[in-house]
Amino acid sequence: MKTSKTKTPKSVLIAGPCVIESLENLRSIATKLQPLANNERLDFYFKASFDKANRTSLESYRGPGLEKGLEMLQTIKEEFGYKILTDVHESYQASVAAKVADILQIPAFLCRQTDLIVEVSQTNAIVNIKKGQFMNPKDMQYSVLKALKTRDKSIQSPTYETALKNGVWLCERGSSFGYGNLVVDMRSLKIMREFAPVIFDATHSVQMPGGANGKSSGDSSFAPILARAAAAVGIDGLFAETHVDPKNALSDGANMLKPDELEQLVTDMLKIQNLF
């Protein structure tokens, strides 16, 4: 979020459901997020996935797919005036998704996939690369450089300013801590901000991968705590998944915040910014 340590003009807020469940569900969540979207201190993006291609189980809900999913995101964009983030898992999806999305996100498990990074970077969308749960934060500079050199071959090394100018961001979402658990090393925020703007993913950071018999679990009560800590360290924005009924969400319900909980969290974080 925007503090003295934040170099972007506004604090980025990326919020929305994990996966597209229906257009009605998207509209419901988008409506609840209007107070945050209208906050002049925030640069707001609505997020949702058209396909969750890395679900633990084959039986788990993945989403409506590329074509139908993008149609629904385009509807939200037109009806609410929101900028859009969605993630892509395969190279061929990038150019199609970029017709709707303002940010294309590369999932954490795919953060080293050169072909995917290159295809996404050839679009006009901002590139948001999630740090893999298995990655040394210092090594994310090489993923950033793949994107930067795709956009400008003259770039030899990644810097914060160069990445900001060329629309290449990183996203911290925790590191593997034994089996079925994650921990956030707050030092990674400072490390990665040496070579790119950094978004903190508060809700995936509290995930417990594969912790619910073929599904991931988590504890959303820790998300505000980690987000406040990240804001104090210094970040460029917040990523948080939200749902009107997390317990019945079709993906990552245990991690998600209700819209009113997210609004309170953002209010608290904006107060923290004023301390620096």
Curated annotation (Swiss-Prot):
Respond yes or no to whether keyword Ribonucleoprotein is given for this record: no
Bridged cysteine pairs (disulfide):
none
Name this protein carries in UniProt: 2-dehydro-3-deoxyphosphooctonate aldolase
Q: Name one GO cellular component term.
A: cytosol
Main location per UniProt? cytoplasm
Q: Indicate whether Cytoplasm appears among the record's keywords.
A: yes
The EC number(s) given in the record are 2.5.1.55
* Keyword list, A-Z: Cytoplasm, Lipopolysaccharide biosynthesis, Transferase
